[in-house]
């Protein structure tokens, strides 16, 4: 029988900001994989509210007591980052059918670029199916309550940045 090697997964994203949905996926990921690398995307077409350094720092604070989680950043193609990392799996979360089409296309393109890299999809916990960083930003900017929607370690920083007059 072939020896089973520890599998490291990369969980990529903009994380602007990190949500409880993201956190839930990473915590489920470390039950499935030996290690999860949270890879914060630097070059993105999204209009981010937090700099790359701030997003990396927030993720590091969230996972500082979780030795199976490493936080890193990358620019360029995700496949190139994964090829240079100890990982051989890309971990992605799916909230709804609408996520699947986009994620499926990306997984196929990544596989075309490097056939040795697999993409694994985890369904988002039902409590967080509606949640996205964009929704968090929209609710906060318009005075809505986001307590419990972002990890407590970054709540104050997110409020300070997003809520007018804070």
Curated annotation (Swiss-Prot):
It is found in: Cytoplasm. Its main location: cytoplasm. GO terms for cellular component: cytoplasm. CDD domains: PPAT. ATP binds at residues 14-15, 22, 93-95, 103, 128-134. Its cofactor is Mg(2+). Pathway: Cofactor biosynthesis; coenzyme A biosynthesis; CoA from (R)-pantothenate: step 4/5. The record marks 22 as: Transition state stabilizer. One of its GO terms (biological process) is coenzyme A biosynthetic process. It catalyses: (R)-4'-phosphopantetheine + ATP + H(+) = 3'-dephospho-CoA + diphosphate. Pfam families: CTP_transf_like. It is an enzyme of class 2 (transferase). One of its GO terms (molecular function) is ATP binding. Its EC number is 2.7.7.3. Transmembrane segments: none annotated. Keywords: ATP-binding, Coenzyme A biosynthesis, Cytoplasm, Magnesium, Nucleotide-binding, Nucleotidyltransferase, Transferase. Belongs to the bacterial CoaD family. Homohexamer. This is Phosphopantetheine adenylyltransferase. The lineage of its organism: Bacteria, Pseudomonadati, Thermodesulfobacteriota, Desulfovibrionia, Desulfovibrionales. The gene is coaD.
């Amino acid at each position: 029988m072939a020896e089973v090697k520890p599998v490291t997964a990369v969980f990529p994203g903009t994380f602007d900001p990190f949500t409880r949905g993201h956190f839930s996926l990473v915590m489920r990921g470390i039950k499935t994989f030996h290690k999860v690398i949270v890879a914060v995307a630097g070059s993105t077409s999204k209009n981010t509210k937090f700099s790359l350094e701030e997003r990396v720092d927030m993720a590091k604070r969230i996972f500082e007591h979780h030795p199976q989680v490493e936080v890193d950043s990358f620019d360029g193609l995700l496949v190139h980052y994964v090829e240079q990392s100890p990982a051989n799996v890309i971990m992605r979360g799916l909230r709804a059918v609408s996520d699947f089409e986009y994620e499926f296309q990306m997984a196929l393109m990544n596989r075309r670029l490097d056939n040795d890299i697999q993409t694994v999809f985890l369904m988002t916990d039902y409590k967080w199916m509606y949640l996205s960083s964009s929704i968090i930003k929209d609710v906060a900017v318009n005075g809505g309550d986001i307590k419990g929607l972002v990890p407590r370690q970054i709540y104050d920083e997110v409020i300070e940045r997003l809520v007018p007059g804070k």
